[in-house]
């Protein structure tokens, strides 16, 4: 309890160094100021001349719901430890920063209804360390967590059971950086939320997660405890609506739906081949982007999922080449040699573009691209059946998060017997799309964009919300 009081006093002192000036009423200024911090779950630059992140998209949707006259300004602080002090100084109307609801924080701010549950876990290097089985195995080891996080609160409670437990708090390193240090052998353990671990494991496959620490925590937006409650009430109403109409699930799937699709060995192999095989074909992927407008890294991800960048790959059904084209598709696209890497890559990219054009205008990005990839794998006719089935099941046929629930049902007689195109192995396109999404994310982090000398196409934004397109 004494430590809790000290922590609260420290936060209040930080907030009171400057005399807080009242923030202008947003109903007058029509501007909503939101404090957040950089991170994969909050707010980041996606590389497509767009900002992205689950919190970013939620805030954009919320402000859009307030009315067209309202705008949003993001106040981005260096790390999570600065978020609540900034809010207490009245520099923002609320905080959208992947904040867990904790006892300490509830003394300082007012939380909205939660919109996500997360589980804290111990992160370790599975090449250097055995998974700890209990808290005792963390003693006398190097543990670090970011300052000002709920992780340190959790460790403090564990210390009551194991007084010898010790750790350091880093004011300038976030969870991403600390997990990277664990992966590189510079740190024994850190603590992170499961959804963040799943994302980072796609870049560091040697990371393991174990020991669920306590019960799952809830994530919410934070508002000042005092002052007018108009915006707070609007935010609660917003979360009630998006929880009921599927928008929240749609956004969560956009950022985390593909995160745990691949096994560590898949990621390791992909990274190795990115170093050895990808350079041979990069020029061809660049050319495919220049001809179609598709991000070259997306085309490369499709090619890897199809053939592992093996231009001689052939299936038992005679699907062949880098992009695994059927004879019929190759003929329609004018391909004379499916084993020719250039012909295959460019034809495959053109085919994805053709499929995107077939999809109704009601389907926006990035869902439009994910559905085109599903059609690439299973055929456009079966995709249409899945969309029809989704609608029958009271799901949204324009959202990938719902269509991917309907696709596996195409293999069940009670469903496929009622559809025009009948049976299909609908689970395959779900695996295909989610794997491509993950490979694309990895490449987008590791490889720079390609900017043609004479850009003539717009590249779909596959990170942020909505159907925004940005010139690359």
UniProtKB/Swiss-Prot annotation:
Topological category with respect to the lipid bilayer: Peripheral membrane protein
Signal peptide start and end residues: 1-24
Main location: membrane
Active site per the UniProt annotation: 306
One Pfam family cited in the UniProt record for this chain: SLT
Enzyme Commission numbers on file: 4.2.2.n1
Record-stated family: In the N-terminal section; belongs to the bacterial solute-binding protein 3 family.
Function, as annotated: Murein-degrading enzyme that degrades murein glycan strands and insoluble, high-molecular weight murein sacculi, with the concomitant formation of a 1,6-anhydromuramoyl product. Lytic transglycosylases (LTs) play an integral role in the metabolism of the peptidoglycan (PG) sacculus. Their lytic action creates space within the PG sacculus to allow for its expansion as well as for the insertion of various structures such as secretion systems and flagella.
NCBIfam families for the chain: PRK10859.1 (NF008112)
Region LT domain, annotated ranges: 260-472
Catalytic activity entry: Exolytic cleavage of the (1->4)-beta-glycosidic linkage between N-acetylmuramic acid (MurNAc) and N-acetylglucosamine (GlcNAc) residues in peptidoglycan, from either the reducing or the non-reducing ends of the peptidoglycan chains, with concomitant formation of a 1,6-anhydrobond in the MurNAc residue
Entry's Gene Ontology cellular component terms: cell outer membrane
Keyword Transmembrane assigned: no
Protein name stated in the entry: Membrane-bound lytic murein transglycosylase F
Organism field: Methylobacillus flagellatus (strain ATCC 51484 / DSM 6875 / VKM B-1610 / KT)
Molecular function GO terms recorded: peptidoglycan lytic transglycosylase activity
Cellular localisation: Cell outer membrane
Region Non-LT domain, residue ranges: 25-259
